[in-house]
């Protein structure tokens, strides 16, 4: 039990409402151009939308043909709805194939989306 919980200072973990994929972001970190099909030189973004107040570590784990190729995490805190964006990067372009992004909140998998580079 969190001692400061008695004083109302502990915050609950965030709940992921939606996971968006696309090639362009809006100013509020939501996806402007939704897609699950990309070209090798496209930018690839995942936007994690939360609808409640809370604080958590959100991670994006990117895989290609079943092998993890990138992972990034951020500590975030929101008072109400929020969006956290992650960019999947490749300096030389993405190989053609099947990909997946998995979202973890405080180390626990909560959402995933498959996508394709063609």
Model-derived features: where do they sit?
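Aromatic sugar-binding surface patches on proteins
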Residues: 78-88
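Conserved aromatic beta-strand anchor motif in extracellular beta-sandwich/beta-rich domains
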Residues: 60-66, 103
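Short, exposed beta-strand-loop hairpins at the edges of beta-sheets
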Residues: 91-117
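Short beta-strand edge segments in extracellular beta-sheet folds
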Residues: 75-77, 115-118
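Solvent-exposed serine/threonine-rich low-complexity stretches and specific carbohydrate-binding patches
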Residues: 69-79
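Short, compositionally biased P/S/T/A/G/V-rich stretches that sit at domain boundaries
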Residues: 11-40
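Short edge beta-strand/loop segments characteristic of extracellular beta-sandwich folds
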Residues: 43-51
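C-terminal motif of bacterial Sec signal peptides marking the signal peptidase cleavage site
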Residues: 6-9
């Amino acid at each position: 039990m969190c001692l400061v919980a008695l004083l109302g200072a502990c915050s609950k973990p965030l709940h992921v409402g939606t996971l968006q994929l696309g090639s362009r972001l809006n100013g509020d970190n939501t996806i402007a151009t939704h897609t699950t099909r990309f070209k090798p030189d496209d930018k690839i973004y995942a936007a994690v939308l939360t609808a409640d107040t809370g604080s958590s570590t959100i991670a994006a784990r990117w895989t290609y043909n079943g092998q993890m190729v990138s992972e990034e995490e951020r500590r975030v805190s929101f008072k109400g709805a929020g969006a956290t964006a992650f960019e999947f990067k490749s300096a030389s372009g993405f190989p053609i194939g099947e990909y997946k992004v998995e979202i973890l909140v405080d180390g626990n998998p909560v959402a995933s989306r498959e996508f394709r580079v063609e």
